[in-house]
Swiss-Prot record:
Protein name: Phosphoglucosamine mutase
Catalytic class of the enzyme: isomerase
Entry keyword set: Isomerase, Magnesium, Metal-binding, Phosphoprotein
PTM-bearing positions, type Phosphoserine: 102
Alphabetized Pfam families for the sequence: PGM_PMM_I (PF02878), PGM_PMM_II (PF02879), PGM_PMM_III (PF02880), PGM_PMM_IV (PF00408)
Entry PTM: Activated by phosphorylation.
Organism: Staphylococcus aureus (strain bovine RF122 / ET3-1)
Binding site for Mg(2+): 102, 242, 244, 246
Length: 451
């Protein structure tokens, strides 16, 4: 991570940290690094956004910056992040830009870039943009007169993306009753249209954005209302998306949450059965549940773990030519179809498995036994010392011996805060909590803020 770019683009409180001035510079410098210096006089750039009230302000500034470098900008309007990634690739654009802070509160916003291949930027590309941001007045081209180009609206891009998604499944969803939660974000109109077009009987919540209510007690980070609605309407299942549509969480017919691990298992199992799973491998992060790995083992499916963050999952998938990966939080990447986590794509693939197998979501998810998990955050003076602390290693070894293979420990420094995260999975809730507390107590005693 650099001074401006985090793990998922540039983010901050809109108009305070992520200002229109910064958005202009990101458009100008990002457009130069990623498009103009390839030799294109008028590189094509696609720009999309979510439903946040600050989106229009940042969009205007960003587009001004892009046009100032000579870019030909096509404004997509409200669309999902994976929609921008797909269209950038499909339409042969040099660059795609999404204005969104994903599952964050409405006050935040962000800007993330996609290269012409539909993938997020490399560290090297981000560093090149950051170097320009830190210069006072970098000498860059400034077209004048007839060399300045108009921007255009391409709102039908969303429909093009939905038509593509529809083509990835071989069945319709007639007879399935599905509740959709759009998080009052990018998928608020996309999801009902897509599932309706596939002949599902749909109910919706969180699909009435007003610019201020994105992710507010709805969507994939707040699936409680969805669970209630599924049970109340006697629906087959529910799907909750996040603000920019790159992640998904499901709810079964009984109102039970089905997370990213379970969704990956269900889809991966079907792909494996149909000999469509590259190298019989699913890529996940270290936060995936132990039950996920045990279930995969029983199916003869291999797994590969990365650091937390969908960008690391994608990097590993590209390295090994794997076509399914994701996170427990609901970022699921299906590389045969798109280059980033895609909630709508994952949702219709999951619905397709349910329709084709004739099994309920609870039956499919029940094949993976989730181990109870306890997570404790400990505030420390130097979070990176945890990896070499002898006392912490000692208590971890002791707990592992006691669990005798029926559990898992993960102790890691937080990526964003001065914390050590202690996560334990065990056979029972009581064991998970007890073991996590034992380890957290040692971390606190040896590394806490008062040390």
């Amino acid at each position: 991570m650099g001074k401006y770019f985090g793990t998922d683009g540039v983010r901050g409180v809109a108009n305070q940290e992520l200002t229109p001035e910064l958005a202009f510079k990101l458009g100008r410098y990002g457009g130069y690094v990623l498009a103009h210096n390839k030799g294109e006089k008028h590189p094509r750039v696609l720009v999309g956004r979510d439903t946040r009230v600050s989106g229009e302000m940042l969009e205007s500034a960003l587009i001004a910056g892009l046009i100032s470098i000579g870019a030909e900008v096509m404004r997509l309007g409200i669309i999902s992040t994976p929609g921008v990634a797909y269209l950038t690739r499909d339409m042969g654009a040099e660059l795609g830009v999404m204005i969104s802070a994903s599952h964050n509160p409405v006050a935040d916003n962000g800007i993330k870039f996609f290269g012409s291949d539909g993938f997020k930027l490399s560290d090297e590309q981000e560093n090149e943009i950051e170097a320009l941001l830190d210069q006072e007045n970098p000498e860059l081209p400034r077209p004048v007169g007839n060399d300045i180009v108009h921007y255009s609206d391409y709102f039908e891009g969303a429909q093009k993306y939905l038509s593509y998604l529809k083509s990835t499944v071989d069945v319709n969803f007639e007879g399935l009753k599905i509740v959709l939660d759009g998080a009052n974000g990018s998928t608020s109109s996309l999801a009902p249209f897509l599932f309706g077009d596939l002949e599902a009987d749909t109910e919706t919540i969180g699909c009435s954005p007003d610019g201020y209510n994105i992710n507010e007690k709805c969507g994939s980070t707040h699936p409680e209302k969805l669970a209630e609605k599924v049970v109340e309407t006697e629906s087959d299942f529910g799907l909750a998306f996040d603000g920019d549509g790159d992640r998904i969480i499901a709810v079964d017919e009984n109102g039970q949450i089905v997370d990213g691990d379970q969704i990956m298992f269900i889809i991966g199992q079907e792909m494996h059965k149909n000999q469509e799973l590259n190298n019989d491998m699913i890529v996940s992060t270290v936060m995936s549940n132990l039950g996920f790995y045990k279930a995969l083992e029983q199916e003869g499916i291999k797994s590969n773990k990365t650091k937390v963050g969908d960008r690391y999952v994608v990097e590993e998938m590209r390295r090994g030519n794997y076509n399914l990966g994701g996170e427990q939080s609901g970022h699921i990447v299906m590389m045969d179809y798109n280059t980033t986590g895609d909630g709508l794509l994952t949702g219709i693939q999951l619905a397709s498995v349910i329709k084709m197998t004739g099994k309920s979501l609870s039956e499919l998810a029940g094949q993976m036994k989730k181990y109870p998990q306890s997570l404790i955050n400990v505030r420390v003076t130097d979070k990176y010392r945890v990896e070499e602390n002898v006392d912490v290693k000692e208590v971890m070894t002791k707990v592992e011996v006691e669990m005798n293979g029926e559990g898992r420990i993960l102790v890691r420094p937080s990526g964003t805060e001065p914390l050590v995260r202690v996560m334990v999975e065990a056979a029972t809730d009581e064991d998970a909590e007890r073991y996590a507390q034992q380890i957290a107590d040692v971390v606190q005693d040896k590394m806490g803020l008062d040390k």
